[in-house]
């Protein structure tokens, strides 16, 4: 043994492998107000003790590696390490458990979702000692929240810009999502906005393809928007998708939209990436553009119950990164979404302060301090018969978005938009009169259809359409 090795060994270094729990499992630790807290659903390999598995997660997502290293002695280890401080059993689960981990705030770069996720959901998710790992929730402390701009504008500013109050907003995704020319696409936008919708939308995979380049689409959609505005005397918007192959190209598209004078642009925040999304959110605030966020790719990450990242975490990350709208599921439509869980992360998007509530999947009390709220967007397989339930579930601060439920009506696009607007106005009026939308919803729609032939036609088409499948992701 060399003299240097003997000296280092004498002050505590010992090469080899030791159990993570000896360093990273600290059940007596009281989390600090400034710590970032994480709740992980951990499925260890057979025979693996929960304390060791939870400590391994804390180690591999903070300062640890598989063996002690010399340079551990050159840092203030207790200050920077993550700590597995509590373990909960999962009700009804044979093997998984919830491990709570506290991370010191100094581990994270200010204002960077990318850096936060590189640590907390980095290599640890491929760790062989774990069969599966899922990040269920994060507590973002105010000290870290205040380093982010957050949404470009927020709910109240959007309502003021649009001059629309007291009801949910209505939208429509233009279909077919791929294949239309820019001029025909703009025609569909005009017909939907003229029929009474507040917004139309590019689908998530509409970027700049050979059949419709982005600049042509932006121009025809802006023309349609302004024509519909002049005829309805209502402020309208179209979510022009600025998502691109590079950040520079994305910003160029947003600049062009701003020069056209349109009120809103769109971004696919998961496929585009958090760094690009935050850059676009900053541009939108500086230039008065609203920012609609699509969550394309989310189900790859969040749908499996035991592995991945729950959408409530992705929703919190979006509120930090920036967006004025985000798709949130519908509860009643064609896409995955259990009611209590969905309402839990809808509150996390909109409210200033959300209390811990395990019945809705909220593991931590979350204060948002001054960060603006985000409007949830209900979209996917919904139609006029769903309007009472959607109005009751999501309330006024929401966007209810009907693609096929507008463009698939028998009389055409504009009558489809009329049907949705009439159904919404009827539900809002009934709610304001004290009627129970959950119990009387179908009757409310039938009564409104008596004086709206457009709604009557839509009701006839969709009367037997339901998506009755159990949610995969449950509490």
Curated annotation (Swiss-Prot):
Q: Which residues carry this modification: N-acetylproline?
A: 3
Coiled-coil regions listed: none
Q: Where is the active site?
A: 175 (proton acceptor), 294 (proton acceptor)
Which key words tag this protein in UniProt?
Acetylation, Calvin cycle, Carbon dioxide fixation, Chloroplast, Disulfide bond, Lyase, Magnesium, Metal-binding, Methylation, Monooxygenase, Oxidoreductase, Photorespiration, Photosynthesis, Plastid
The cellular location(s) given in this protein's UniProt record come to: Plastid, Chloroplast
Site entry: Transition state stabilizer: 334
* First-level EC class: lyase
Any idea which residues bear N6,N6,N6-trimethyllysine here?
14
Q: Where does Mg(2+) bind?
A: 201, 203-204
Recorded GO cellular component terms are:
chloroplast
- What residues make up the propeptide removed on maturation? 1-2
Mind telling me how this protein is modified after translation? The disulfide bond which can form in the large chain dimeric partners within the hexadecamer appears to be associated with oxidative stress and protein turnover.
Output the GO biological process annotations, alphabetical, semicolon-separated.
photorespiration; reductive pentose-phosphate cycle
Q: Which residues bind substrate?
A: 123, 173, 177, 295, 327, 379
The record's note on quaternary structure and interaction partners says: Heterohexadecamer of 8 large chains and 8 small chains; disulfide-linked. The disulfide link is formed within the large subunit homodimers.
> Which HAMAP family would you find in this protein's record?
RuBisCO_L_type1
Function description: RuBisCO catalyzes two reactions: the carboxylation of D-ribulose 1,5-bisphosphate, the primary event in carbon dioxide fixation, as well as the oxidative fragmentation of the pentose substrate in the photorespiration process. Both reactions occur simultaneously and in competition at the same active site.
**Family label:** Belongs to the RuBisCO large chain family. Type I subfamily.
Identify the PANTHER family for this entry. RIBULOSE BISPHOSPHATE CARBOXYLASE, RIBULOSE BISPHOSPHATE CARBOXYLASE LARGE CHAIN
Reproduce the miscellaneous comment text: The basic functional RuBisCO is composed of a large chain homodimer in a 'head-to-tail' conformation. In form I RuBisCO this homodimer is arranged in a barrel-like tetramer with the small subunits forming a tetrameric 'cap' on each end of the 'barrel'.
Q: What is this protein called?
A: Ribulose bisphosphate carboxylase large chain
Q: Which organism is it from?
A: Plumbago auriculata
Q: Which gene encodes it?
A: rbcL
